[in-house]
Regions:
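Hydrophobic anchor at the start of a short beta-strand
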Residues: 32-33, 56, 109, 162-164
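Canonical P-loop GTPase G-domain recognition
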Residues: 134, 141-197
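Inter-motif core of Ras-like GTPase G domains
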Residues: 95-116, 126-133
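Short, surface-exposed amphipathic charged segments that create phosphate/polyanion-binding patches used
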Residues: 71-76, 176-186, 206-211
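Structural beta-sheet core signal
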Residues: 35, 111, 135-137
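Nucleotide-state-sensitive switch-loop elements of NTP-binding domains
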Residues: 2-13, 17-104, 140, 173
Length: 233
């Protein structure tokens, strides 16, 4: 039995920084961690966790959608974590597509949001935020209390049931509360019978499989076309 916790969010919001603090806090509380980092190009983030003494594996999706890649590798990730004997398995996503939601029902799903981005940012995150169990607001040291409350309100409009944690990932402020939340989360014994919380976007157009030419004649599979209003003024 182990806890499996997903950290999703856009690029450069501070997922790795927050998670580095969390694994350290959990170690102090007697819980061992393992980390799986999904990325597209570079696997350098795994060295951040290995420097903390945390078993870490990196998956590079390359030309494949990283969130589709993650879901396709859940059985293998689970088997790897079995060999590490960890109490908590953290999975950090690549953070590219705001529409994707690789969380499953048995995971504890978290969404990391940059508090400095915009008060409208939460409304653009889709299932990544709306299906999350908890939300981490990062860079809160760079905004006022009033601005923080506005962002929290925007998060609640999308996901009113999520626990919200305000974190300064540079100093570690707020990480203790997040660590206690994860410590109290339920453990699961297997991925068997697990299902995604939300369907993935279709990924079967001609460009998904390597087409480079532009034009309707070269578009096959699931192709979405815009509708243009006659009066756009």
């Amino acid at each position: 039995m182990r806890k499996i916790v997903l950290f999703s969010g856009s690029s450069a919001v501070g997922k790795t920084a927050v998670l580095s603090w969390v694994v350290d806090c959990l170690r102090e509380r007697g819980l061992s961690s393992a980390v799986c980092k999904i990325d597209c190009v570079s696997d350098e983030d795994k060295e951040t966790f290995r420097a903390l003494g945390v078993p870490t594996v990196a998956g590079i999706s390359a030309d494949i959608c990283p969130d589709h890649y993650l879901v396709s590798n859940i059985p293998e990730i689970w088997s790897w974590a079995d060999g590490q004997g960890s109490d908590v398995l953290f999975v950090e996503t690549a953070g590219l597509c705001n529409r994707c939601s690789p969380a499953t029902r048995s995971m504890v799903a978290g969404c990391v949001v940059d508090a400095t981005a915009s008060c409208k940012a939460p409304g653009h995150l889709g299932p990544m935020l709306s299906q999350a169990d908890f939300v981490v607001l990062t860079k809160v040291d760079m905004i006022s209390q009033a601005e923080r409350e506005i962002v929290c309100r925007a998060v609640a409009d999308v996901n009113p049931g999520a626990e919200v944690f305000a974190v300064d990932a540079l100093a570690g402020y707020g990480v203790q509360a997040l660590s206690r939340y994860i410590e109290a989360a339920p453990a699961v014994g297997t991925y068997e019978g697990d299902v995604l919380r939300h369907a993935m976007p279709a990924g079967v157009c001609s460009y998904c499989v390597g087409e480079c030419r532009v034009g309707s004649a070269f578009q096959q599979g699931v192709v979405g076309k815009m509708e243009f209003e006659e009066d756009a003024r």
